[in-house]
């Protein structure tokens, strides 16, 4: 893993990176349902979900969104930022759920930094355009702009 300064991150604008695959198991979906209180049958009841057009249980859209940090951490070519005291999620733009993620399927993130700004001395903000792909599917599960702030 390469280590770069926060300022050097600006030189990576437009450079695409791809994460490793992550399995979205039924257990993960069930735990997310418990954490959020969203127990709709399409997520947690395999027998009833078989009767839907999906044919199986599917991940919550917000579960898919919440995988962004895990996928970022599992991106082999992502640089490690030197001198960062902390990083925080600032928000998101243009979040769209384009296809359901079937239980026990695998997803990965394809991302690139599209904007980088110094907000004030020691505080930086960057926007990452991210697509979450489903293994074996031509249609992505989700697209989003993910905004992160880092401090040194």
Walk through the language-model features, giving the residues of each.
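HotDog/MaoC-like acyl-thioester-processing domains
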Residues: 1-12, 97-152
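Hot-dog-fold acyl-thioester-processing enzymes
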Residues: 2-90
């Amino acid at each position: 893993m390469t280590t770069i300064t926060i300022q050097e991150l600006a030189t990576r604008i437009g450079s695409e990176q791809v994460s490793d695959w992550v399995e979205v198991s039924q257990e993960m979906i069930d735990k997310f349902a418990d954490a959020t209180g969203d127990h709709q049958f399409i997520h947690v009841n395999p027998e009833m979900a078989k009767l839907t057009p999906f044919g199986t249980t599917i991940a919550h859209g917000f579960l898919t969104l919440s995988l962004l940090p895990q996928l970022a951490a599992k991106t082999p070519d992502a640089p490690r930022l030197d001198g960062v005291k902390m990083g925080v999620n600032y928000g998101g733009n243009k979040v769209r759920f384009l296809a359901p993620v079937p239980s026990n399927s695998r997803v990965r993130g394809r991302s690139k930094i599209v904007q980088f700004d110094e907000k004030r001395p020691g505080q930086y903000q960057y926007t990452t355009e991210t697509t979450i792909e489903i293994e074996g599917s031509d249609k992505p599960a989700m697209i989003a702009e993910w905004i992160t702030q880092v401090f040194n």
